[in-house]
């Protein structure tokens, strides 16, 4: 990865009940020299995620919410604390994140070839139908700052919102070969996994309505 001027990259890891994998993800990120800082945001986890993160307290920036505020709020909090020129988002449920994956994700934007990069898991020749909802992303921090309030309120619809914000800009999709993240069924009980899938689907639909049909969203959304 070559850049004409020295730049810094902050990596933000939103964490919600990822005790099985978060230690490995953080350890790998700390071992990769291109990151200026690792920011972990515990989003009100009810498992042992916070305990795992506290093991790295001297080496990471740790933000912890007492209640689950949603992925959008977690990312917004990380962006506010970030010192880097660029911010990378990495999910906490990855099992085999490597420096090769990180280099593939960062290269297009550090080379000046993109305004944003989305890295999607690719296995064999099978298409990834959810590629545009990937959590592995890189942006110029300054381009996100005007949208912090929207990001904070988007919950699990944050990827949909970011896609809309960067519509019409140069967004590069890069395959992250054989990258694996645990499914909810692998992390939760079957009942809880189904519940979380439904909640996340609702949040995505809610975000789409908010962006594309605000009048309808105002009618359907519960009042405060």
Where are these regions (language model features)?
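Hydrophobic helical membrane-anchoring modules
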Residues: 1-2, 164-224
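Cell-envelope/extracellular polymer assembly enzymes that use nucleotide-activated donors
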Residues: 8-10, 37, 161
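Short, well-formed alpha-helical segments that are part of the catalytic scaffolds
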Residues: 17-31
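Conserved donor nucleotide-binding strand/loop of the catalytic core
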Residues: 36, 50-81
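A conserved acidic beta->alpha catalytic loop
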Residues: 42-50
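Short aromatic/hydrophobic "clamp" motif used to bind/position activated sugar donors
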Residues: 87
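Conserved donor-nucleotide/metal-binding helix-loop-beta segment in metal-dependent transferases, i.e.
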Residues: 99-120
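Short beta-strand-to-loop element that shapes/binds the nucleotide-sugar donor at the catalytic cleft/hinge
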Residues: 117-129
